[in-house]
């Protein structure tokens, strides 16, 4: 790797352990490494929620320890226009979007790459994602990270092979405990820092309070599948299919104490439809329709393909048959019924370790009952 010394890599430094160790690994491989901290949120930066200041301090501490420069950039306008506005629009029409996927597409691998190119003269960018890249026949493929528990390829399916060719993923071959051990051995400030679980760049907020500041609250009835009103909701946007917690309803008059689950949203009448039991037929689907398709490096499908699909992060792969439709959408048929298929979320397709691409779930095929 002696020629890496001529190559400049800009690492997206989030202030977390994964990007910290990524920067060190690239140093060990001989690259010229610099860091970039992206600030992507301006609203209500109060101390109760906002972690941006402490994240920046952690990123600075790590870069000081490693002896590398840290640049900063503000992408708040791009984030608002290209990620957050879409996020709110989807919630407003009753869908449940995944902002992290859009954030990766628009910010972490578009705005970041353009800035690294134009302003910092980068040969590559790097992030602390648990994914791998493989170059086959002149095109870069996206592969799952080796740590099954942390694999993040689901979030990166919107990347194209040309983008991937400019990206390095140093920890994709490592397990999370090994990453933490390396950070501890190096004495990095982020070694014991817990993983973030909040919305991409917005941090650990009380989601209901946060959403309520941007969208009008529209209370309505919670209705059982047999038409009985069993409670009230504060807004359909606060609920997602398969949700159990936070409904505030107990057993029914007939004595059943099985927990309630959200099985549907009646947008026309602002009603939340619920049923008891997580295997209720109304919650099960035999397939889905996906649109807004993106393929990482292969051509769009022209014939049916057997593969696996993930319909949410950290869910086991589902065996399926994927069939292209005349309108450009995909029909996905599961081998076995699946619970809580959620419009607005992403369906991501795999052949073994290879992430083929994916699309947005537009509709689900309910289990006939």
Curated annotation (Swiss-Prot):
The record marks 129, 345 as: Interaction with tRNA. The keyword tRNA processing applies. GO terms for cellular component: cytoplasm. Residues 150-152, 312-313 are annotated as: Interaction with tRNA. It is an enzyme of class 2 (transferase). It catalyses: S-sulfanyl-L-cysteinyl-[protein] + uridine(34) in tRNA + AH2 + ATP = 2-thiouridine(34) in tRNA + L-cysteinyl-[protein] + A + AMP + diphosphate + H(+). One of its GO terms (biological process) is tRNA wobble position uridine thiolation. Disulfide bonds join 103-200. Residues 98-100 are annotated as: Interaction with target base in tRNA. It comes from the Bacteria. Keywords: ATP-binding, Cytoplasm, Disulfide bond, Nucleotide-binding, RNA-binding, Transferase, tRNA processing, tRNA-binding. The keyword Cytoplasm applies. Belongs to the MnmA/TRMU family. Interacts with TusE. Catalyzes the 2-thiolation of uridine at the wobble position (U34) of tRNA(Lys), tRNA(Glu) and tRNA(Gln), leading to the formation of s(2)U34, the first step of tRNA-mnm(5)s(2)U34 synthesis. Sulfur is provided by IscS, via a sulfur-relay system. Binds ATP and its substrate tRNAs. This is tRNA-specific 2-thiouridylase MnmA. It comes from Sodalis glossinidius (strain morsitans). The lineage of its organism: Bacteria, Pseudomonadati, Pseudomonadota, Gammaproteobacteria, Enterobacterales. The gene is mnmA.
């Amino acid at each position: 790797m002696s020629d890496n010394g001529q190559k400049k890599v800009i690492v997206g430094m989030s202030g977390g352990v994964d990007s910290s160790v990524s920067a060190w690994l690239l140093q060990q491989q001989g690259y010229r490494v610099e860091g970039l901290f992206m600030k992507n949120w301006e609203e209500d930066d109060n101390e109760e929620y906002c972690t941006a200041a402490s994240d920046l301090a952690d990123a600075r501490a790590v870069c000081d320890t490693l002896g590398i420069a840290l640049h900063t950039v503000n992408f708040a306008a791009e984030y608002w226009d290209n990620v957050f506005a879409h996020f709110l629009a989807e919630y407003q029409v009753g869908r449940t979007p995944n902002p992290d996927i859009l954030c990766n597409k628009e910010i972490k691998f578009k705005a970041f790459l353009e800035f690294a190119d134009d302003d910092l003269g980068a040969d590559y960018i790097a992030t602390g994602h648990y994914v791998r890249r493989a170059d086959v026949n002149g095109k870069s493929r996206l592969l799952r990270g080796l740590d099954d528990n942390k694999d993040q390829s689901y979030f990166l399916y919107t990347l194209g092979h040309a983008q991937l060719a400019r990206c390095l993923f140093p920890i994709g071959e490592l397990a999370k405990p090994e990453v933490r051990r390396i950070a501890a051995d190096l004495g990095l400030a982020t070694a014991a820092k817990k993983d973030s679980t909040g919305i991409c760049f917005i941090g650990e907020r009380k989601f209901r309070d946060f959403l309520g500041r941007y969208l009008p609250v529209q209370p309505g009835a919670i209705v059982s599948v047999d038409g009985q009103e069993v409670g009230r909701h504060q807004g359909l946007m606060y609920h997602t299919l398969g949700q159990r917690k936070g409904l505030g309803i107990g057993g029914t008059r007939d004595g059943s104490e099985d927990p309630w689950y959200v099985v549907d949203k009646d947008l026309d009448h602002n009603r939340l439809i619920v049923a008891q039991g997580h295997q209720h037929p109304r919650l099960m689907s035999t397939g889905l329709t996906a649109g807004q398709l993106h393929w990482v490096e292969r051509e769009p499908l022209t014939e049916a393909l057997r593969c696996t699909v993930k319909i949410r992060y950290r869910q086991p792969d589902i065996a399926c048959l994927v069939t292209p439709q005349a309108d450009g959408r995909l029909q996905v048929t599961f081998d076995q019924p699946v619970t809580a298929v959620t419009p607005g979320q992403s369906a991501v397709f795999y052949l073994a370790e290879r992430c083929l691409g994916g699309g947005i779930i537009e509709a689900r095929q309910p289990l006939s009952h």
